[in-house]
């Protein structure tokens, strides 16, 4: 009697374009909604409180980025290891990975809330608060830290739920949180006159709703099971999860480091321009939040390819892995060019959404957008390439790309060029870093495919 045929996984057989579309759209929308919490706060605070209130939300924003960085390290690392294990038919190891992740998330969430509460004053000073915005920044930060564990749960569990084959569920969770936040913001800010405190409370309530709904899904997992016996983490598996997730973590954590560095440079060198330190800080923070919407699209495409690449690499379908990368890189390039056009053509219109009727603020919007985003049309390629290496279990190459862009090029150049050219020098570091990371990405991926051909993996 012939053995029963194994049911084929869609990751191995379905059209690549359909798979990327299925996984990327919910993922991108999920991340967009995460960032929209802060953008909605900024819009309502800008209209209801003004530039000082906007500066306060900008100062606290790196906390959100750090939280999402931890979430992506744990969630993406778990999802990548799960996909590799499932591709190799290692079901028990996939179950262990998912179970470990729950414990890691709880521990990280408790740490974020407690540390954020205890060191709120130091965090606000480190993140570049001006003297006039200090108290508002502190009030806002002391509240939002209690929503960070739920932001962590929702951001990390989306990767696991996506790898489980249900990306639409994550989108529903995030939309619920965003709707709650958007409804409560005007009530607390305008109706109850609570200012930035009201914005923070609305954000936390929305994050609790979204994170709670994601936690409920753990009982509905299809491809893996959470087992109580495997909740206690082991060093080996935890290290493997972190190893696979560290590129996602560093991409986000370096984004936070860039923003903290630039916040301080905007405060210092912006004060020497006609814009002033508070306006420069507020506008830069707004630009970074709008940038995060574009960034979410790239993460959506990149994250969508991770389970495809991981499963097919584990199944030795190397032609399919290469085809997936090519399609992801093409999509990323098109999206990059589109956002570049928006940033260059409509900077004042974007600024008007946040603060209207202030010509100095709008002049700063136009200048910062056009200089800081000068090479943004190249941006998406480095993210698609880093995700490709992460998906096939090569974290060193995946890590090198974001590390070089931000830690080796952008931050040092911003510090050096600002000393030589002031305000504009700090802004010019970003387009230079985009060009360098684009060239590095091409070099690494071409070398990888040449290696595959030499080993006979590609037809």
Tell where the protein language model's regions lie, with residue ranges:
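Transmembrane helical elements of multi-pass membrane transporters/channels
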Residues: 22-41, 143, 177, 206-210, ...
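Hydrophobic transmembrane alpha-helices of multi-pass small-molecule transporters
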Residues: 66, 181-185, 211-215, 293-296, ...
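Residue-level signal for short hydrophobic patches within transmembrane helices
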Residues: 17-36, 40, 63-70, 146, ...
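Small-residue-rich hydrophobic transmembrane alpha-helices
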Residues: 54-114, 151-170, 263, 283-341, ...
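Helix-terminus/linker motif at the lipid-water interface of multi-pass membrane proteins
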Residues: 36-54, 124-131, 187-194, 253-287, ...
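Short runs within selected transmembrane alpha-helices of multi-pass transporters and secretion channels
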Residues: 75, 144-162, 170-178, 199-214, ...
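Short alpha-helical transmembrane segments in multi-pass integral membrane proteins
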Residues: 1-27, 82-149, 191-246, 309-375, ...
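Small-residue hotspots at the loop-to-helix junctions and early N-terminal turns
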Residues: 51-62, 137, 141, 200, ...
């Amino acid at each position: 009697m012939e053995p029963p045929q194994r049911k084929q996984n869609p990751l191995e057989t379905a059209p690549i374009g359909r798979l990327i579309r299925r996984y990327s759209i919910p993922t991108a929308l999920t991340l967009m909604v995460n960032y929209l919490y802060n953008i909605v706060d900024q819009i309502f605070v800008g209209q209801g409180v003004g530039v000082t209130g906007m500066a306060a939300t900008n100062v606290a924003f790196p906390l959100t980025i750090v939280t999402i960085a931890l979430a992506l390290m744990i969630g993406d690392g778990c999802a990548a290891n799960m996909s590799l294990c499932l591709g190799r038919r290692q079901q028990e190891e996939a179950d262990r990975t998912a179970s470990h992740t729950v414990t890691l998330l709880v521990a990280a969430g408790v740490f974020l809330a407690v540390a954020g509460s205890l060191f709120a004053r130091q965090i606000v000073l480190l993140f570049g608060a001006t003297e006039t915005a200090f108290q508002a920044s502190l009030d806002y930060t002391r509240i939002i830290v209690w929503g960070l564990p739920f932001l962590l749960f929702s951001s990390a569990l989306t990767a696991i739920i996506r790898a489980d084959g249900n990306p639409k569920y994550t989108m529903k969770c995030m939309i619920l949180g965003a709707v709650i936040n958007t409804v409560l913001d005007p009530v607390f800010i305008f109706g109850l006159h609570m200012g930035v405190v009201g914005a923070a409370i609305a954000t936390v309530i929305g994050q609790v709703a979204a994170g709670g709904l994601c936690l409920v899904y753990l009982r509905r997992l299809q491809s893996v099971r959470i087992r109580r016996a495997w909740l206690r983490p082991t060093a080996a598996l935890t290290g493997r999860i972190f190893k696979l997730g560290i590129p996602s973590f560093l991409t986000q954590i370096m984004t936070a480091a860039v923003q903290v560095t630039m916040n301080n440079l905007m405060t210092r060198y912006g004060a020497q321009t006609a814009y002033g330190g508070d306006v420069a800080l507020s506008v830069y923070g707004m630009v970074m939040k709008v940038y995060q919407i574009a960034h979410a699209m790239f993460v959506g495409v990149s994250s969508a390819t991770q389970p495809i690449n991981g499963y097919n690499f584990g199944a030795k379908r190397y032609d399919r892995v290469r085809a997936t990368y090519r399609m992801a890189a093409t999509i990323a390039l098109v999206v990059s060019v589109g956002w570049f056009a928006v940033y260059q053509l409509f900077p004042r219109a974007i600024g008007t959404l946040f603060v209207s009727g202030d010509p100095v603020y709008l002049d700063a919007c136009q200048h910062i957008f056009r200089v800081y985003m000068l090479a943004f049309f190249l941006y998406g390629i480095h993210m698609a390439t880093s995700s490709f290496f992460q998906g096939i279990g090569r974290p060193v190459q995946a890590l090198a790309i974001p590390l070089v862009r931000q830690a080796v090029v952008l931050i040092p150049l911003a510090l050096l060029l600002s000393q030589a050219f002031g305000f504009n020098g700090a802004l010019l570091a970003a387009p230079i870093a985009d060009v360098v990371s684009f060239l590095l990405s091409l070099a690494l991926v071409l070398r990888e495919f040449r290696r595959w051909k030499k080993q006979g993996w590609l037809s």
